[in-house]
From Swiss-Prot:
GO cellular component, one term: stress fiber
Any one Gene Ontology molecular-function term assigned to this protein's record: actin filament binding
Name of this chain's protein: Tropomyosin alpha-3 chain
Stretches the record annotates as Disordered: 21-42
Family affiliation: Belongs to the tropomyosin family.
Length: 248
């Protein structure tokens, strides 16, 4: 009975030990699985760390390149800002120049209008002088005809005719000058403005020439009248002499 109890006790103990062994083996397997899981987790973590390190390195390299690009961009930005400042200053200078040019153009337009007005006035004076010259030329031609008729009758008029021819040459030269001035009036407004005073001076000279020519014509007509009277007196004396000779 006691032996049976001992066997039972031994069996129970063996069962307990077997259970403990199974439990231990199960725990060992579980621990092995945990160890294996931890190993895989560690390997995965190490791989992730290595990947992170590579990513960090790539990020650092990318950061370096980004910093270089940033430095380049900042430098370009600074240059662009300087260029923009210079452009702005240039624009201000151009705007100031444009404003001055506009003011200058307005002034030139005013001067151009004044020059046109003065030129029109000068043209009017010139046309008036030219008409007077035409009239005087006609009078001079008629005077020349009368002078030539008087020359055929009286040789004393040769000197006066020579003077009249000289005056006629002067008149032709003056007419040529007026023709040249008329061509100059058709030049550009700027040249007209620059030479306006000269044109007015020439117009005044032409008026003085006209006055001189009119006086010359008057003098020639007076001299022609005197010559006719002298010729008439001479003719009367000649007729009287012939009459006296016939009576003798």
């Amino acid at each position: 009975m006691a032996g049976s109890t001992t066997i039972e006790a031994v069996k129970r103990k063996i069962q307990v030990l077997q259970q403990q062994a199974d439990d231990a083996e199960e725990r060992a397997e579980r621990l092995q699985r945990e160890v294996e899981g931890e190993r895989r987790a560690r390997e995965q973590a190490e791989a992730e760390v290595a990947s992170l390190n590579r990513r960090i390195q790539l990020v650092e390299e990318e950061l370096d390149r980004a910093q270089e690009r940033l430095a380049t961009a900042l430098q370009k930005l600074e240059e662009a800002e300087k260029a923009a400042d210079e452009s702005e200053r240039g624009m201000k200078v151009i705007e100031n120049r444009a404003l001055k040019d506009e003011e200058k153009m307005e002034l030139q337009e005013i001067q151009l209008k004044e020059a046109k007005h003065i030129a029109e006035e000068a043209d009017r004076k010139y046309e008036e002088v030219a008409r007077k010259l035409v009239i005087i030329e006609g009078d001079l031609e008629r005077t020349e005809e009368r002078a030539e008729l008087a020359e055929s009758r009286c040789r004393e008029m040769d000197e006066q005719i020579r003077l009249m021819d000289q005056n006629l040459k002067c008149l032709s030269a003056a007419e040529e000058k007026y023709s040249q001035k008329e061509d100059k009036y058709e030049e550009e407004i700027k040249i007209l403005t620059d030479k306006l005073k000269e044109a007015e001076t020439r117009a005044e000279f032409a008026e003085r020439s006209v006055a001189k020519l009119e006086k010359t014509i008057d003098d020639l007509e007076d001299k022609l009248k005197c010559t006719k009277e002298e010729h008439l007196c001479t003719q009367r004396m000649l007729d009287q002499t012939l009459l006296d000779l016939n009576e003798m």
